[in-house]
Amino acid sequence: FTGASASVKGYPHSSIFAMGKHGLRGLASAMGRELAPQGVHVCHFVIDGGVRNALKGRTEGPDDPSDKYLCPDAIAETYMHVVGQDRSSWSWEIELRPYGENY
């Protein structure tokens, strides 16, 4: 499951979005406990920042670092790492944020 910062903290003027993302996190938690006995690994990913794309990949000047956004390839590598985890050390939740993101 893919969540957002709002999965774990609320922001002003985003109550509806936070409600949905908190609900998604709860669903992932319940499904993880329900499906683990059958060998199904459920993980919730918190994407805490913007994802670089064709528009966001450009820098706007010397004060705009390229590490301001998450790299799609790095996100995919993290997902694939979780898919390949041994059952003895499954991750339940992974938070991903770019170096330049405040938290």
Regions flagged by a language model, labelled:
Residues 37-52, 58-103:
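C-terminal helical subdomain
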